[in-house]
């Protein structure tokens, strides 16, 4: 699959996941906003009803105290008699209706007859005397009730005016029963669906706090609500109740918490998708690097095979057989190229180490200074071939480590070989090897004056198959396994390695290995 196709699919899927995540976040934000508005509306409705309840309570208390039986009864019962005869009970009640000036307007008698078994009363009205008939008496009763209603209305208006006048002079503590106020708050909050812990306080017209509940906590204006207790009072004399909900945020969050798992699942899918795309690109890059490796490996094998083939053909020449010196020379070439080919095969076999968790190491006590000196003596001829020089500063006073001699030797050799491969064509190679001690560690540095490494490539030099060059041209011999092998061996020895480099200046590799014994 082409890289451009992977990018297009990745962008489409990524945008789809991001859009889905954005919609979920927007939906949660809208739900939180809606729940807040719903909560605010419910609380304000409850507080408004509390205000009405408090006003009603005060009005009822005033009416019970001030209204008296001031009006006269126009309809009064004058007498009552009871007779029992032949199993019947007869009750007679006589009523007189008087006009406002006190004169007798009409009189009638109400008789009720009850039989003992059924207890069902029977009533009839008998006219005794007066100027009016029963219909006229009924009209008189209606007028009297109407007059009584008007009187009571005027009486209530008078009481209300006096109540408002006197109430404005009383303190809020005298006007409100705080225990009842708490009950009103609780019942109205429940009626409006707000079943949440609340704290409240009462503030008088001067802004002083005259009451607060025992566990009151002021959580700021966002979670607090205020409501005038007596809305008809003048603004200068108005008292308010302040209610705070300490668990409001948790209450709002709990109402939308069912969406959180869905959003988390989407985020997990997005992360998994990103990781999958990363793996796809990494595998594609690894494939390209393997192809590059095959090209380089083919070139590395082609040269010794061609040389051996040519030498084998020369041996068929009868003239070669007659010249012992020529025969010995050709045999030496075949032997050298065979060793070279075997060495390349061994390097390819190093690939299998990267598929194992840990290499098989033959650990023993080593003097790192002596080991490095031996490698330098062997490698000096190759450096001199390029008109270079190699120096050493073996300053480590405690160079003893517990390591695999063969693998550590290969590590030093590979790092020196890299210095030769990446030397500047126009300058002579200068290679320096240094050792020193740090607490509990042996430090080894190998520094050259080669072409250097770009910063963006520096962190990749230890990757398998990675080689610092342009394109797939075989400009430097090797398979791209050397530094990956070096890093793995150092890590298997519980050490660390890092690279420091500057383009066109040189590269420095620093190795830290644990000492066998601390001084």
Swiss-Prot record:
Alphabetized PROSITE patterns for the sequence: HIS_KIN
Short name of any one Pfam family annotated for the protein: HisKA
Histidine kinase domain segment(s): 296-517
PTM annotation (Phosphohistidine): residues: 299
Enzyme kind, highest EC tier: transferase
Naturally occurring in which organism (per UniProt): Bacteroides fragilis (strain YCH46)
Entries under PANTHER family matching the protein: HISTIDINE KINASE, TWO-COMPONENT HISTIDINE KINASE
Protein name stated in the entry: Sensor protein RprX
TM ranges: 5-25, 260-280
InterPro entries, A to Z: HATPase_C_sf (IPR036890), His_kinase_dom (IPR005467), HisK_dim/P_dom (IPR003661), HisK_dim/P_sf (IPR036097), Light-responsive_reg (IPR052545), Sig_transdc_His_kin-like_C (IPR004358)
Source domain of life: Bacteria
EC numbers for this chain: 2.7.13.3
Catalysis performed (reactions): ATP + protein L-histidine = ADP + protein N-phospho-L-histidine
GO cellular component: membrane; plasma membrane
Membrane topology of the entry: Multi-pass membrane protein
Localisation per UniProt entry: Cell membrane
Biological role: Member of the two-component regulatory system RprX/RprY. May activate RprY by phosphorylation.
Keywords, sorted A to Z: ATP-binding, Cell membrane, Kinase, Membrane, Nucleotide-binding, Phosphoprotein, Transferase, Transmembrane, Transmembrane helix, Two-component regulatory system
């Amino acid at each position: 699959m082409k890289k451009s196709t992977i990018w297009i699919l990745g962008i489409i899927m990524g945008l789809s996941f991001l859009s889905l995540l954005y919609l979920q976040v927007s939906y949660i934000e809208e739900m939180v906003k809606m729940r807040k508005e719903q909560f605010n509306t419910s609380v304000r409705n409850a507080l408004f009803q509390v205000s009405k309840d408090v006003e009603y309570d005060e009005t009822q208390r005033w009416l019970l105290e001030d209204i008296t039986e001031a009006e006269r009864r126009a309809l009064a019962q004058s007498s009552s008699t009871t007779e029992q005869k032949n199993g019947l009970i007869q009750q007679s009640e006589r009523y007189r209706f008087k006009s406002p000036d006190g004169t007798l307007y009409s009189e009638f008698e109400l008789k009720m007859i009850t039989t003992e078994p059924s207890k069902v009363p029977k009533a009839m009205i008998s006219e005794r005397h007066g100027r009016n008939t029963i219909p006229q008496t009924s009209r008189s009763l209606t007028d009297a009730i109407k007059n009584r209603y008007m009187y009571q209305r005027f009486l209530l208006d008078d009481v209300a005016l006096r109540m408002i006048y006197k109430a404005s002079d009383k303190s809020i503590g005298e006007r409100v029963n705080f225990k009842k106020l708490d009950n009103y708050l609780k019942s109205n909050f429940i009626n409006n669906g707000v079943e949440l812990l609340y704290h409240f306080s009462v503030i008088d017209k001067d802004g002083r706090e005259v009451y607060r509940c025992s566990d009151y906590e002021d959580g700021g204006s966002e979670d607090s609500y205020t409501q005038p207790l007596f809305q008809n009072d003048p603004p200068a004399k108005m008292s308010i109740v302040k209610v705070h909900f300490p668990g409001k945020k948790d209450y709002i969050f709990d109402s939308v918490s069912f969406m959180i798992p869905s959003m988390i699942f989407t985020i997990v899918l997005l992360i998994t998708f990103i990781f999958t795309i990363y793996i796809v690109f990494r595998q594609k890059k690894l494939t390209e690097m393997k192809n590059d490796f095959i090209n380089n490996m083919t070139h590395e094998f082609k040269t010794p095979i061609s040389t051996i083939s040519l030498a084998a053909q020369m041996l068929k020449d009868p003239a070669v057989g007659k010249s012992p010196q020529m025969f010995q020379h050709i045999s030496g070439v075949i032997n050298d190229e065979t060793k070279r080919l075997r060495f390349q095969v061994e390097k390819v076999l190093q690939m299998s180490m990267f598929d194992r968790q840990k290499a098989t190491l033959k650990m023993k006590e080593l003097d790192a200074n002596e080991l490095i000196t031996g490698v330098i003596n062997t490698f000096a001829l190759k450096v001199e071939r390029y008109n270079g020089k190699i120096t050493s500063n073996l300053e480590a006073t405690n160079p003893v480590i517990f390591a695999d001699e063969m693998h550590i030797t290969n590590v030093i050799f590979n790092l020196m070989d890299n210095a030769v491969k990446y030397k500047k064509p126009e300058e002579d190679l200068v290679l320096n090897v240094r050792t020193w001690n740090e607490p509990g560690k042996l430090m080894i540095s190998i520094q050259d004056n080669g072409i250097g490494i770009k910063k963006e490539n520096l962190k990749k030099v230890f990757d398998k198959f990675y080689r610092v060059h342009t394109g797939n041209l075989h400009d430097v011999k090797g398979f791209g396994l050397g530094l990956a092998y070096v890093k793995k061996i150092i890590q298997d020895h519980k050490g660390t390695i890092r690279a420091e480099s500057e383009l066109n200046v040189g590269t420095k590799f620093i190795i830290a290995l644990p000492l066998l014994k601390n001084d």
